[in-house]
Amino acid sequence: PKPYIMYTDVHGITWNDVRNKPDFGEAWPILAPVLEGADFLVAHNASFDKGVLYGCCEFYGLTPPDLPFRCTVQLARRVLNIRPAHLANVCRVLGLKLNHHEPLSDAQACAQIALAALRAAP
């Protein structure tokens, strides 16, 4: 990782948090097998996350996962009829705990939204 971390004010990740951690190119071979057997990836505002993932893979000369993305913004709007569909509001409406922009909390909330949409889908 490089010492300049964008959006620290949003996600709270600092240089001290990552200075001795692997960069994406080193981490991907460890992370990619976790996706084996997955049918899809889920993200809140999936087009953004897909762009970041594909951009990182391209930068490091890696093959991105060949998986469709499901967007919990769209699921919240279309299946759960929640508006506005930003993460904090969807969590509030569904009664989900959220420490917004803390990566694990955001990921867990996203998974819970996807599960709620699956349960509610006709």
Region locations from a protein language model:
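Conserved beta-strand -> loop -> alpha-helix junction used to position metal-binding or nucleic-acid-contacting
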Residues: 63-76
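Ser/Thr-centric signal marking residues that sit
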Residues: 8, 72, 110
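Acidic two-metal-ion nuclease catalytic site recognized across multiple nuclease folds
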Residues: 111-122
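Conserved non-catalytic scaffold segment of RNase H-like nuclease domains
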Residues: 1-66, 81-84, 88-101
